[in-house]
Amino acid sequence: MTKILSQRSNFSPLIFHRQFWNSLNIVWNKYDRKRVQEIGPDRACAEWLVRCGGSVRFKNWGTFSSHFNTIPAGASNQFKIEEIRAINASITSEGFAHLDGLSDLKKIHLEKCDQICDSSIARCNKVKDSLESIELIDLAQISENGLAYLAGL
């Protein structure tokens, strides 16, 4: 006997798609202390940003690195990040822990990154001694409270 189901399933491909990408974002933004100790804070930060769709420019380099193969290899203190650029990147507040230990970061450009919130801006205080410029463009989750953190930079 054949039974035909007349009810629609509650399964939505769109919901599954979002859950899948949210799960990846959690993994991609996770701070790995052991990895930072192995390769140094600058390379670990560069790997995080590239993995999430951002790019970095190293001190005394003219171009941005936006792919793993363009991140320079070498001693952990040899290549220092000078500029971060994230446009439509999937970076989250948790990933901003990668800023810890960056001593030469001068500029941060964040644009249309939907998952950046006020606490992300608060974590920028880790680089306040070297930071000269921060550009925040079209960040929907940043409120006046988040902007207030900039006063401390």
Residues of each region from the PLM?
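N-terminal mitochondrial targeting presequence
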Residues: M1-D32
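Short, intrinsically disordered, charge-balanced linker/junction segments flanking boundaries
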Residues: L147-L153
